[in-house]
Amino acid sequence: MTHLVPLYRFLGSHLPWSLPRLKFLSLFLIARIRCRTVNWVELSNGFNPHANSRSSYRRIQRFFAKFEFGALSIACLLFSMIADPGGTYTVVIDRTTWRFGQTALNLLCLGIVYQGVTIPLFTDVLDKKGNSNTNERKKRFQLLVDFTGVDGMEAFVADR
């Protein structure tokens, strides 16, 4: 747990959350990396070696049941972690379909490129089949512009 304090301090400099929430998120992220899974039961085993895994599991459940992540806060955190201050970045927007069990999710994702990989900042589930329309794409793009501006934007990439 030597990484816990630097991680929650870093997160605290970007997220306006209480210390217990920052500590939980830090534990959760470390467990996620250590366990290489998103399964809460398995994550609870890697959460705190001195705590009962059922207690850790209930802690995970309570956090996600009672706390609402602000999409803009998470996007700001990700952006501040990967964008070079004063540097340029490429924006990518794409519509894709993911399967969640038997359910097909039609997603519109907007992200920035980091070391050749697009990191999604905003993702919307489109309540329809097929492509997004211009207004949906403009709405996502405007969210990014509202908190980053356009100064460092080198390129905007979209298909079609």
Language-model-derived ranges and their functions:
Residues 1-160:
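Conserved, well-structured functional cores that handle cations and Mg-NTP chemistry
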